[in-house]
Design a protein with these regions (language model features):
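A compositional/biophysical signature of low hydrophobicity enriched in polar/charged and small residues
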Residues: 1-167
Length: 167
């Protein structure tokens, strides 16, 4: 019997997602032991989560620097009009583009890119010029990288005190 996404995200489902985010290579027996289900029930739950789109595959994290991709940068693109669609299609063909996000505000797209050198980054920026105005920020370090989704605990939010109004 198929479950909907709400039912799949019960206590067992949330524990399962936490375990998979920590180590997606665990066996069904070990996953089941950790979340309190049999290996068969765990496997069925995984299959259903894949079918409804909660899970989208199991990937390895690869160290970009081990591949010689020493430079990481964000490029904000302002293009507008017809150039937006052309640029969106073009960046999908670029191996250097790791992520591309459509934005509100003054910029149209935000690209996360990696290259082997500053020379390669410069060549990439020049290739983007016909599509609009690229503004580049080099990444010096990443204090928070690939944060897991909080699925079993509450999300932590920062609260600010409201400023006192002058009368």
């Amino acid at each position: 019997m198929a479950m909907d996404s709400t039912t799949l995200l019960d206590n067992f489902g949330r524990k399962l997602l936490d375990e998979l985010q920590a180590n997606a290579r665990l066996s069904l027996a070990e996953l089941g032991r950790r979340i309190g289900l049999s290996p068969t029930a765990t496997g069925e739950r995984l299959k259903q989560m894949e079918e409804v789109g909660i899970l989208h595959g199991y990937t390895a994290e690869i160290d970009r620097e081990a591949l010689g991709l020493e430079v990481m940068a964000f490029i904000r693109m302002s293009c507008g009009g017809q150039n937006y669609h052309r640029l969106r299609d073009y960046v999908q063909t670029l191996e250097e583009v790791r992520e591309c996000h459509h934005l509100t505000g003054g910029d149209d797209l935000l690209l996360k890119v990696t290259t082997t050198s500053l020379d390669d980054l410069e060549a990439l920026i020049e290739a983007l010029l016909p599509y609009g105005n690229p503004v580049t920020s080099l990444v010096l370090s990443s204090p928070v990288e690939r944060r897991k989704f909080s699925v079993t605990g509450k999300l932590t939010t920062v609260t600010r005190k409201s400023p006192k109004r002058r009368r």
